[in-house]
Amino acid sequence: MLINRKWAMPSSDTFDVPPIGEFVKSYLRQSKVSVDPFARNKRWATYTNDLNPDTAAEHHLDALEFLEMLRDTGTIADLVIFDPPYSARQVAECYQQVGRTVTMQDTQGKSWSDWKDAVAEIVPVGGIVLSFGWNTVGMGRKHNFEILEILMVCHGGVHNDTICMAERKTALQGNMFNETHLTKRAGDTATPSDNVAVLHK
């Protein structure tokens, strides 16, 4: 496991922080099919989504609906960029920005758990998930992932560090979901697209 610590000024857009942006791009360069369910204005991944319709993302669905749509269409992603709201307050702010009513379930841990379950369903053995937040929970052993790299970015003052994790899937999850569409390893022919993600500034 590789562990690094760097310093950078904070930004409301995670990937505009230079060391974090480079962390993401280093994995995108190796990816054929990538997914970003919380993309905001970044069109770096093959498939991008953000709940806010005023962003540049390709889709504007609830993150769980977006991930389930990809699963149901047979999409296999060798890389998922998982940068959700980091706290219940941030979830509430995101929903309020688009005029959506915030429920207790939205601000409880179940949202994060459901998102991770859905991510695991589109990532094959050998696939990578990049997780961002204030802790190192990540996808975890529950979803059969191992940690490859941790980058801690200090922002100084009273700001929380941003913790960036790269994890690799080591096995399927058995009968939790019909994962027959994930029998190919990352690096095999990907479906439905072999497009390499184009990095937009």
Report the location of each language-model feature.
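Class I S-adenosyl-L-methionine-dependent methyltransferase catalytic core
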Residues: 1-201
